Amino acid sequence: MSKFWSPFVKDLVPYVPGEQPKLTRLVKLNTNENPYGPSPKALAAMQAELNDNLRLYPDPNSDLLKNAVAKYYGVQNNQVFLGNGSDEVLAHIFHGLLQHDQPILFPDISYSFYPVYCGLYGITFDAVPLDAQFRINPADYAKPNGGIIFPNPNAPTGCLLALEAVEQILKGSPDSVVVVDEAYIDFGGETAISLVDRYPNLLVTQTLSKSRSLAGLRVGLAVGHPDLIEALERIKNSFNSYPIDRMANVGAAAAFEDREYFDKTCALVIESREWVVAQLQAKGFEVLPSAANFIFARHPQHDAAGLAAKLREQGVIVRHFKQERIAQFLRISIGTPEQNQALIDGLGEL
């Protein structure tokens, strides 16, 4: 703590990112990165951008990428917002659209950045408990609020809320912004972007870090009513007018255009997920239904922290959370077949 800190900094509780180990020999199944590389077309586009133009500022509107997103989802350009990763997009949403008199609502088990943003921007919140099966009950959100946000599929549980249930939440809070955080939607869910033209209070966020294998590039987006997008543009241009650099603009646009590679790699992850689930269940694990590129599992006879430590000794890193309700669960990213086999081998006989 420093005497130079602003008063509010002393009370901030920052987000703790997943471990990024320096040892390359470790099997890294803790941060939900895609085990398959980016689209070759995305890599080629970025390589072509390595030229003298890097001395120039990028397009502040990122029109190339914005056009690609709009075309992909069948929306208008003024319904698309872009940011330096979906975390930045979410930060602008909390700052510009969720600061109201009423507390905002989000699940008690969800993305741990949400309460961090609330602390950063002075937003009150009500953490709504998931049910006994770790699922959202839409009726629990039909109460006065200053906004609603939830990940779908949920992080860290992986459970998916059906589009009909998302619509139920929207209908229950027509005067509040409802944010659906779809970081993992491409691994088994149906995007709520199809609803944005019917619900002016709906904002859908996505990332290119997961299904499009561009976590190192930092590109996120939001799709919604033009009024909501304009608010985010105002925040962006009061903070950083150039969040998407030249490499990200061309690489992300090419990734959206390469549907064949996207479909192939998503299918591989889904196939591997089902294999991992079956292997863990054979070892006695309870595995929650997952529509993400990770699974959430616990063993009735073994402590989760102990299992995580055992796996680490075998060179496999998974994610363990200390939050009381999920302290006996492990979140395990889906890797390549070889990485997944290393996970199962590392667990040994239980």
Curated annotation (Swiss-Prot):
Pathway stated in the Swiss-Prot or TrEMBL entry: Amino-acid biosynthesis; L-histidine biosynthesis; L-histidine from 5-phospho-alpha-D-ribose 1-diphosphate: step 7/9
Keyword Amino-acid biosynthesis found: yes
UniProt catalytic activity: L-histidinol phosphate + 2-oxoglutarate = 3-(imidazol-4-yl)-2-oxopropyl phosphate + L-glutamate
PROSITE patterns: AA_TRANSFER_CLASS_2
Cofactor needs: pyridoxal 5'-phosphate
GO molecular function, one term: histidinol-phosphate transaminase activity
UniProt-listed Gene3D superfamilies: Aspartate Aminotransferase, domain 1, Type I PLP-dependent aspartate aminotransferase-like (Major domain)
GO biological process, one term: L-histidine biosynthetic process
InterPro entries tied to this protein: Aminotrans_II_pyridoxalP_BS, Aminotransferase_I/II_large, HisP_aminotrans, HistidinolP_aminotransfase, PyrdxlP-dep_Trfase, PyrdxlP-dep_Trfase_major, PyrdxlP-dep_Trfase_small
Family annotation (Pfam families): Aminotran_1_2
Alphabetized CDD domains for the sequence: AAT_like
Entry's family note: Belongs to the class-II pyridoxal-phosphate-dependent aminotransferase family. Histidinol-phosphate aminotransferase subfamily.
HAMAP family assigned: HisC_aminotrans_2
Descriptive protein name: Histidinol-phosphate aminotransferase 1
Organism: Pseudomonas fluorescens (strain Pf0-1)
Gene name as annotated: hisC1
